[in-house]
């Protein structure tokens, strides 16, 4: 509030630094990013802030890779090692929930590792994929399915998981990426009109919440519009042709073969 850009807080373990920061967050009342140097500390602070701010949206944003091996080439043995990665779906869901919370609420606190400094989807692109469903409005069902697919949702009429949806008669069920407890959003329609939007447990039938309006956010944090994807494909193809030409002109047949 005094216009200071930086404030250093020193103290040994157990001296109440987290509690002090929590009081600052409460007084400033702004969206907050708490950046730490590893996942272990991030998990610890995430739990502590959840206890200190039970009514705020406290989120967790760390790297979603359980394993990552970048591509490499060993000239001596002419060995090419392809890129390999294993992603953690639960952490991916938490990352998406964190991004959605920033767009939806002003009382968001995100505890993050250094993974948060790397670029994500263009915020404007991400916002363009967000849309609302309202009780009483008329919808074009095919257009709704298209919007869901554009937002990276996958249609699965058998097994519902975060980031999927299914259609059964006049009922559309969607599992937002931020739902981790097995709940679904069920949209009841009569013809093209939305009659009811509820959050329920599909196994017990228990209704958790009734909505008049429900926002649909992208299923993944790296979501882009069709237009941006088409633009990227043109750029990628142009760069491919440029590199192929370079390798051919310099007699690098092996590199040319790999790209082709």
Model-derived features: positions:
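ASCE RecA-like P-loop NTPase motor cores
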Residues: 1-260
């Amino acid at each position: 509030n005094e216009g200071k850009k930086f404030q250093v807080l020193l103290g040994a373990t157990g001296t109440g630094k987290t509690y002090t920061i929590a009081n600052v967050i409460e007084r400033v009342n702004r969206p907050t990013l708490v950046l730490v140097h590893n996942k272990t500390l991030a998990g610890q602070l995430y739990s502590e802030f959840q206890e200190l701010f039970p009514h705020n949206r406290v989120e967790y944003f760390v790297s979603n890779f359980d394993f990552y091996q970048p591509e490499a080439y060993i000239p001596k043995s002419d060995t090419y090692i392809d890129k390999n990665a294993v992603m953690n779906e639960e952490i991916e869901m938490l990352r998406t929930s964190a991004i959605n919370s920033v767009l939806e609420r002003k009382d968001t606190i995100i505890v993050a590792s250094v993974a948060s400094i790397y670029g994500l989807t263009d915020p404007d692109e991400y916002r363009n994929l967000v849309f609302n469903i309202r009780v009483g409005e008329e919808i074009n069902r095919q257009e709704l399915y298209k919007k869901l697919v554009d937002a990276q949702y996958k249609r699965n009429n058998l097994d519902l998981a975060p980031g999927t949806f299914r259609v059964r008669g006049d009922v559309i069920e969607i599992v937002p990426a931020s739902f981790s407890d097995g709940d679904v959003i069920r949209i009841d329609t009569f013809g093209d009109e939305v009659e009811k939007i509820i959050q329920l447990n599909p196994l017990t039938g228990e209704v958790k919440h009734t909505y008049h309006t429900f926002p649909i956010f992208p299923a993944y944090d790296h979501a882009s519009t069709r237009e941006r994807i088409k633009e990227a494909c043109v750029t990628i193809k142009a760069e491919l042709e440029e590199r192929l030409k370079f390798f051919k002109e310099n007699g690098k047949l092996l590199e040319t073969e790999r790209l082709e």
